[in-house]
Amino acid sequence: MKFFIDTADVKEIREANELGLVDGVTTNPSLIAKSGRRFEEVIKEITGIVDGPISAEVISLEHDGMIAEATELAKIHPNIVIKLPMTPEGLKATKTLYKRGIKTNVTLIFTPMQALLAAKAGATYVSPFVGRLDDISQNGMAIIQEIRTIFDNYGMDAEIIVASIRNPIHVLDSALIGADICTIPYSVMLQLAKHPLTDAGIKKFLEDWEKVPK
């Protein structure tokens, strides 16, 4: 399984990359806004840190505007993946960019059928949002299983990026289901490495070491 980091915070990206945990990065307008920096400036800096797919989202909601934005974003670096909304116009743009050889990540997916449509349009990645489904008392992980089954049934090439991850259990369930990628907030990445028995074991080893004659 590949891990993407879901942030536009360059400091977090550097730290996670140093841990060897970052195969790619996903950003969105909300994350960029939190950084307080210019969009292109942030994206360029990220491409200099991580050698992997960097998802950058368009703002336009209609096909021609999406294509114009995508064309400019794709010029920044070969690793740029264009993030498009799961709408009819987004699907049209996905198809256009597929024909031009530009990679896409269709986002804000909440049903298996939306994922299927995105894959048929030529999306490189599909991003179902599990946490937001959980928030409205639906089972977010259930759609990951359904998407995995559909894609396997038909040999679809689109990779599943599990998004809106809130806790380590989301990552565990994604791995068990066979999702291709989890895009994870840095805080959750750090939680993956923690367990109280690990800390207790280290403490015990150090206490025992102090008893060894020096």
Curated annotation (Swiss-Prot):
One of its GO terms (cellular component) is cytoplasm. GO terms for biological process: carbohydrate metabolic process; pentose-phosphate shunt. It catalyses: D-sedoheptulose 7-phosphate + D-glyceraldehyde 3-phosphate = D-erythrose 4-phosphate + beta-D-fructose 6-phosphate. Transaldolase is important for the balance of metabolites in the pentose-phosphate pathway. Belongs to the transaldolase family. Type 3B subfamily. Pfam families: TAL_FSA. InterPro entries: Aldolase_TIM (IPR013785), TAL/FSA (IPR001585), Transaldolase_3B (IPR022999), Transaldolase_3B/F6P_aldolase (IPR004731), Transaldolase_AS (IPR018225), TSA/FSA_arc/bac (IPR033919). This is Probable transaldolase. One of its GO terms (molecular function) is aldehyde-lyase activity. Keywords: Cytoplasm, Pentose shunt, Schiff base, Transferase. The gene is tal.
